[in-house]
Structure formats: structure tokens, C-alpha cells
Amino acid sequence: MSGATSGLTPEQIGAIDAAHLWHPYSTIGAATGVIPPVVAVAAHGAWLTLIRDGKPIEALDAMSSWWTAIHGHGHSVLDAALTTQLGAMNHVMFGGLTHEPAARLAQLLVDITPAGLETVFFSDSGSVSVQVAVKMALQYWRSRGQPAKRRLMTWRGGYHGDTLTPMSICDPDGGMHSLWTDILARQVFAPQVPRDYDPAYSKAFETQLAQHTPELAAVVVEPVVQGAGGMRFHDPRYLCDVRDICRRHDVLLIFDEIATGFGRTGELFAADHCGVSPDIMCVGKALTGGYLSLAATLCTTDIAHAISVGAAGALMHGPTFMANPLACAVSVASVEVLLGQDWRSRVAEISAGLTAGLEAAQGLPGVIDVRVCGAIGVIECDRSVDLAVATPAALDRRVWLRPFRNLVYAMPPYICPPAEIAQITSAMVEVAGLVG
């Protein structure tokens, strides 16, 4: 344990953390009512080694470490890919240089993503990949001589990241960015997309879009699953409709598949549920199997060509760590591991286990909905979940959960067998029962 923590005791880690470290959506220091983070010292397979009451415990990583570790932790093939690449080249600038890991990953992504996505831009995170997607759309229209097409349209209830432009297309009311409303770009928001298919919704969506066509650069949506905006699911037929609508009105379509890509919904990409191709698509999170931060933005050759011959003469974006060889190499390994197994059966088995296990939450006081899509299970409550209660309750059952707002959910690694899925759902039901 000392090696894993660089010689610091858990108490020392906690003290330094409290004094100096920001966490996602956190305060600094020991604020009243805020529970301190749990110290993690190791991760193997689907299990995390955490320090609780001064002692190590094992807990299932029901979150796949925020939806990334689809193969679990410490996978031998991914470890080997990373080690081999580290021995050859850890990093080189991507300006003026290229390398095999980037080329292999680009070709792999072009081969497996929806048809027509032929060019790849690598970035450091999902938020940045969305930012790049929007810049692609804006530069495309400038190159086409239509600079007025600069606004975006999306469904309410979405989440696309924490940088400024992605923030502007997150849900404006129930999202996490209302603090910045006065400085964010004014986008066009359609009503929340329903779970069940209703052609009238798509008709109303088209009517609203048509009112803004001269100023719309793109429609940006999360296909099938709206993630951090509320873990809501919708019928894939809406994707077919929005694809047709965008084509009719000469508006680009961007799919944000950062949370849904690489099998999470039961298809390799959520777009595959209805067989449509967007003009631009963002992937991330599970891309590297949870090892390093990497995302990609793919677009059609038509868009890439228009940008390249436009006034700027280039796509105006270039991250320092773009196409990092370590991240690209481990991503190739992760995707090949996924494709080399019967991942559909694994996700289907997890889906069945989540459905069966979460049935016990139906009818609990305070529970208003239970839903499953692929390897995603959600219990929606009628009030916010208290992490000070939920976290220890889940750890009592040796499960790491991270509820947010009124949602208790899980997106487990694909390696979890039925017994571990049952353990996860038992903890979820326990936590939901404490909310009511």
C-alpha cells in the first residue's frame, strides 16, 4: 500500500486533499456538511481498494470510474500495450509529426463508427471534443459563405461538458451551469425528448428548427441516453427523425457519444440503434478503457474539405497533448479487446441482471422511476440523494456508487459476472430505500 500511495498514509493523503485539492463540483477544505473523499489505494478487475475507518476494503466499481473502465482495472492486454509504447515513445508534439498509435487508432475509429465519418481529431477530454465539434461546424459554414449560421440547437435535459461552449448546450434550467447563464451563448432549446416515440414531438421539433434555420449551424444531441443531465433514455427513432430534419433544412447534426460509445447501450455506438450517421461525432470516456484521458471528434470528408479550403486554411484548434502516443496505443488495445469478445452478450447479460435486480426498487417510497438501457441502470427518486448517507450504505455492501442529484445509478464494467451485478443492484436498492 505504501508504494501505491508514494509513502503517504491515508491520513496524510486526506489532510493534503482537504487543504489543497479541488474535486469535481466541490468545495475546498472541510466545509460544513461535506463528507471527505474516500482514499483509493489500488484497483484490480472490477474492484477498488479503498480505505474505510483506517482499514482497506474491497468495493465493486459500479461506476466504471465515471463510465470509462469498461474492461475493469489492470487489464493485462491494456497494461502490455501501455508498457510497450512507454518503452518506445511517451509523447511527441503532433504539430508536424505523426506516429503509428495515432494512425492505427484513427483507422480503427473510421472503420467502426457510423458510415461517412472519415476524419479524426484527437483531443484531451470529452468537453474539448464537443468544443472541437462546434468549431468544425462554425468553420464549415464560414467556408460555405454563411457566417450567420452560428447558433446551436439541442434537446433540454442534455449535458455536453464543462467548458464554455459545451456548457451553453447543457440543460439551461435543471443542468449544472445556471450560474453562467448571463455569459453563455444563447442557443435554441427544444423541449425534453420523450422516452416513448411520438411523431408529434418530431414534427414540433422541425417546426421550431425551421424558425431558426438561417442562424443554425448544428443540432447537437446525445443519442439514446442523455447522461449527466439526468440519465434519461429515448426511443432511437427520434435519431432517424432528427437526421432527416437536419438534412431537409441544411443544418449539421452532431452526436455526442462520449458516454454511450463502445457498447454501453447494447450497440457499439448509440447511433447504430437506428442506423443513422451524423455529420460530426464525439467519442471519449471508454475510448482508452479508463487508462488515460483521450477523446476524438470525427467528421465527414465534405466538412473536412470545406474547412481546409476556407479562409483560415486550417481547423483552428491544436491541443498540446493531441494524439498522445500512450493514450492512442492503449485505446487501440481497448477497442481491440472489446471487438475481440462477445461484448453484445456481455452487455445483454448485464442489462438483464440490472433489470432483475432493480425490480425490488419499484414501489419503494420516494422512487418515481426505475429504468435500464444496455449496461446502464437507474433509480430515480423524488428528492436529492444525500451522499453522506448513500456512500456509507453502499460501502457496507462493498459497492462504490456515486449518486447525483436524485439519481442512484450504475454503469458497471463489462467484466462483472451476474453475482457482482446482483451485489451492485442490491446496494442501489438499499440506497434508494434510504431516500424515501
From Swiss-Prot:
S-adenosyl-L-methionine in keyword set: yes
Known catalytic reactions: (8S)-8-amino-7-oxononanoate + S-adenosyl-L-methionine = S-adenosyl-4-methylsulfanyl-2-oxobutanoate + (7R,8S)-7,8-diammoniononanoate
Site (Participates in the substrate recognition with KAPA and in a stacking interaction with the adenine ring of SAM): Y25
Residues engaged in binding pyridoxal 5'-phosphate: G126, S127, D256, P319, T320
Entry EC no(s): 2.6.1.62
GO BP term, pick one: biotin biosynthetic process
Gene Ontology, cellular component aspect: cytoplasm
Modified residues (N6-(pyridoxal phosphate)lysine): K285
Annotated compartments: Cytoplasm
Molecular function terms, GO-annotated: adenosylmethionine-8-amino-7-oxononanoate transaminase activity; pyridoxal phosphate binding
Listed cofactors: pyridoxal 5'-phosphate
Keywords: Aminotransferase, Biotin biosynthesis, Cytoplasm, Pyridoxal phosphate, S-adenosyl-L-methionine, Transferase
Annotated residues for binding of substrate: W66, Y159, K285, G318, R402
Pathway: Cofactor biosynthesis; biotin biosynthesis; 7,8-diaminononanoate from 8-amino-7-oxononanoate (SAM route): step 1/1
Keyword Transmembrane tagged: no
Protein origin, superkingdom: Bacteria
Subunit structure: Homodimer.
Family statement drawn from the similarity comment of this UniProt entry: Belongs to the class-III pyridoxal-phosphate-dependent aminotransferase family. BioA subfamily.
HAMAP family documented for this protein: BioA
Stated role: Catalyzes the transfer of the alpha-amino group from S-adenosyl-L-methionine (SAM) to 7-keto-8-aminopelargonic acid (KAPA) to form 7,8-diaminopelargonic acid (DAPA). It is the only aminotransferase known to utilize SAM as an amino donor.
Protein name: Adenosylmethionine-8-amino-7-oxononanoate aminotransferase
Organism this protein belongs to: Mycobacterium leprae (strain TN)
Taxonomic placement: Bacteria, Bacillati, Actinomycetota, Actinomycetes, Mycobacteriales
Gene: bioA
